[in-house]
């Protein structure tokens, strides 16, 4: 199912207007890691994510906002699910909480693991800007709700559970 098809199905089932804006993207730009993170979302383990603020600045993209919808994509381009941001905050890297790290659902869910993998993930953004990684650099922390878990429910043979953000 494409992002457009999933958005149509979600809107039709939930009563959300199809004119409501949404974005479609893959975690980490896709690949095996992106697919793994999408599966964590579908399993209900991952309810948050983080990006370096610098990445938004480099790409000249607007910051996410509470209430915005996204269709999460797999590396294949197949839509995995619909999420909606419920909280967006800017926090320095060295002040990200263990609670947020746990919500991200990755690895052992510890803050130490989160810092290790996100330092590795954010470093290329700093390098692209000609800067060294900054422990005090701002992170865009997002919390989200999974609204349309089509792949997870399809595998179970159930209908997707629906809600509105």
List where the protein language model places each region.
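Mixed-charge, low-complexity intrinsically disordered regions
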Residues: 1-82, 91-165
